Amino acid sequence: AVGVVAYNGYTNTAKKNAVKTMHSQVIKFIKSEIIKCDMGEDKVMNGNLNCSDRFIANKIGAATQASFEGKFLNPFVSYKENVVAGQAPHQNGTCIIQYNSGGILVSNINTSVGGTLVRVSTCYGETTRLYEEWIVK
């Protein structure tokens, strides 16, 4: 019985670490693809985002989801895609029930100061999450 508890703890930690790595890779992917737009590319994110659309609400989120389709599977819920476009990911630090474990939500919204605010939020436990946001101009 002790071995089962230790094994379950090990696999849970491995799943959390996998989700943290995926979260980081999604952020790096988005930032590097937006830089390509700034350098004059017309389409990025495997052809899923027209650079001229990067300031339109939810376009970056939808393009990111399409780019990662079938590539990152949720280690906690194996039948679910792991990268999902969402309008307001994990608001106020609360993980949405459907994505409590392993879901990476990506959104972008227009800002009053120009540009678009990109948000990447990932839950890897009941209340534990990673969150990063930045403005693309």
Task: Identify the role of each PLM range.
Residues 10-11, 15, 29, 40-42, ...:
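Generic detector of bulky aromatic hydrophobic side chains
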Residues 35-137:
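Periplasmic/extracellular, small/polar-rich flexible segments of pilin-like filament-forming proteins
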Residues 1-25:
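Amphipathic alpha-helical segments typified by the pilin-like N-terminal helix
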Residues 22-41:
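N-terminal alpha-helical signal peptides/signal-anchor transmembrane segments
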